[in-house]
Amino acid sequence: MAFLCQRDSYAREFTTTVVSCCPAELQTDGNGSKKEVLSGFQVVLEDTLLFPEGGGQPDDRGTINDISVLRVTRRGAQADHFTQTPLSPGSQVQVRVDWERRFDHMQQHSGQHLITAVADLLFGLKTTSWELGKLRCVIELDSPSVTAEQVAAIEQSVNQKIRDRLPVSVRELSLDDPEVEQVRGRGLPDDHAGPIRVVTIEGVDSNMCCGTHVNNLSDLQVIKILGTEKGKKNKSNLIFLAGNRVLKWMERSHGSEKALTSLLKCGAEDHVEAVKKLQNATKLLQKNNLNLLRDLAVHTAHTLRSSPAWGGVVTLHRKEGDSEFMNIIANEIGSEETLLFLTVGDEKGAGLFLLAGPTEAVETLGPRVAEVLEGKGAGKKGRFQGKATKMSRRAEVQALLQDYVSTQSAEE
């Protein structure tokens, strides 16, 4: 038996009875990539308004007696609703669906059916899978490439069918019905039982599907195909938005356009050319800056070499600079008798360091320098360099190096 959400995708609330409520746990994504386990209950209802994940469509969100439902999954012919508050079996409850989320899923899913059918009808492009993402939807097509002309033709055709206000209907067929053979589909779940649910766009397509759909293509409003990307081997991914997502995308795009107009001091039609000019100017400045930095590194190396303080341990810190700057200095000095400790970056924060000198000394001291600076590094052939998080401890490194040199001199 189909759930109420499948029989009437436009229903927003209804009353039903709790069948069971059992302790359960739910693993969520939490913050970032860290998994979080929530303790709660799996609630089974006589019928449900909340769609359980399936057919490429995410599950619904909503409430049962104002208690938030955090996940809905299908288990055979029933739906499990995860809540963090128990509900009494046998009690009547009011179920409400998060309509904004539901209607968005209806628009995207019906949009996918329409694009899949039109791509096949016009160009024989078969759909092998699809994904209803949080920001965009992806249809995987069984073709190594899709031309811009094909994309434009598909988009024009699907939007014409939306303007034609074609009805969308749902019906159920028995497994032995000969018509099942004429229906588009990618197979049924292993635990499927009962009749086959078929979604039909009048005159366009009939497709096996368990998801929630609009009852008329006019509810899709519009479909925008953003383009295609290279997919898996010999596959192409077609990226699209339907309905309210197109409006939100236009709002974001218009906001970005206004911001760029203000920053670049030119109209939207000149944005690309203005950015190209900025990129070229930046590349030239970076090239000039690099040449100046190299000249400065050579001059700094000669200054250090001719300094009265030359010998033993020589240190230098500059706020501006990079790894190449330090290596040029080390190359110019080329001394294996002196320990050279160079750093660049924030004096009290993070930065880069380089230790150069006798191979044996550098191999011994390099890891210890990284440890003092609370950083990481690696080295070979008389050099050890890396990243540091505590440049404020440079004086401790200098003391460490001087102690080492003094000890070596005493032993000699």
UniProtKB/Swiss-Prot annotation:
Disulfide bridge positions per record: none
Q: Which family does it belong to?
A: Belongs to the class-II aminoacyl-tRNA synthetase family. Alax-L subfamily.
Protein's gene: Aarsd1
What's this protein's name? Alanyl-tRNA editing protein Aarsd1
Co-factor requirement: Zn(2+)
Kindly state what the record says about how the cofactor is bound: Binds 1 zinc ion per subunit.
Gene Ontology process terms (BP)? alanyl-tRNA aminoacylation; regulation of translational fidelity
Q: Which PROSITE patterns does the UniProt record give? A: AA_TRNA_LIGASE_II_ALA
Subcellular localization, as worded in the UniProt entry = Cytoplasm
Function statement:
Functions in trans to edit the amino acid moiety from incorrectly charged tRNA(Ala).
Per the record, its GO cellular-component terms are:
cytoplasm
Q: Which UniProt keywords apply?
A: Cytoplasm, Metal-binding, Phosphoprotein, Protein biosynthesis, Zinc
Residues with the modification Phosphoserine, per the entry, are S174
Q: Does the keyword Metal-binding apply?
A: yes
The highest taxon in the source lineage is Eukaryota
Q: Which GO terms describe its molecular function?
A: alanine-tRNA ligase activity; aminoacyl-tRNA deacylase activity; ATP binding; metal ion binding; nucleic acid binding; Ser-tRNA(Ala) deacylase activity
* Residue numbers binding Zn(2+): H109, H113, C209, H213
